[in-house]
Amino acid sequence: MARANEIKRGMAVNYNGKLLLVRDIDIQSPSARGAATLYKMRFSDVRTGLKVEERFKGDDLLETITLSRRPVTFSYIDGDEYVFMDDEDYTPYTFKKEQIEDELLFIPEGGIPGMQVLTMEGQVLALELPQTVDMEIVETTPSIKGASASARTKPAAMSTGLVVQVPEYLSSGEKIRIHVEERRFMGRAD
C-alpha cells in the first residue's frame, strides 16, 4: 500500500477491482487553509485499455502492484499484430494494433530506443515508451526567415502520421524532440 502522494507515473495500482496503469498526475493545491492537496490521476485500464480519471487526497491509500519491465525493440508487423523482441532473452511480445494505437504514432519504421514491455505473472499488459522521442518532420509549411523571434507555431507532420505544433522557423527534414505524453515539441534533436 502506498499513499497517493507517493504514486508516480508508470506505476500500477489496484483500485476498485481494476488493474490501472498511471499515465499522468496533476497536483492541485487548494488555496483554502486546511484543505488537502488533491492528486488528479489519469490511468489506463490494463485489461480493457479504457482511460480512467480519479482524484485522491495525499493520504489516501492505494494498493500498488509490482510489474516487470523488459526492454524491447520493434521487430516486425504480422497482419494487424505488432511484434516486439525482448532485448535480453529474445522473447517475442505481440500486440494487436488497437492495443497500442496511441504508441504507434511515436514509433517510426526503424523503431526507437528505450521502449519497455510491462508484464505481470507472464501476461503482457502494456507497451511503455520513453518520455521523449526524436522524429523527423516530413511535411510542414516552408520556414519563415526571421521567425525565431516570434512565438507563433505551425502544424508539422511526422512519418507516422503524428502532427505536432512546431515553431515557424522549422522546415521539412529537420529532426525534433517530442514529449510523448503531452505530444508537444520540446526542441531540435541532437
Swiss-Prot record:
One of its GO terms (molecular function) is translation elongation factor activity. One of its GO terms (biological process) is peptide biosynthetic process. GO terms for cellular component: cytoplasm. It comes from the Bacteria. InterPro entries: Elong-fact-P_C, NA-bd_OB-fold, Rib_uL2_dom2, Transl_elong_fac_P/YeiP, Transl_elong_KOW-like, Transl_elong_p-like_YeiP, Transl_elong_P/YeiP_cen, Transl_elong_P/YeiP_CS. SUPFAM superfamilies: Nucleic acid-binding proteins (SSF50249), Translation proteins SH3-like domain (SSF50104). SMART domains: EFP, Elong-fact-P_C. Belongs to the elongation factor P family. This is Elongation factor P-like protein.
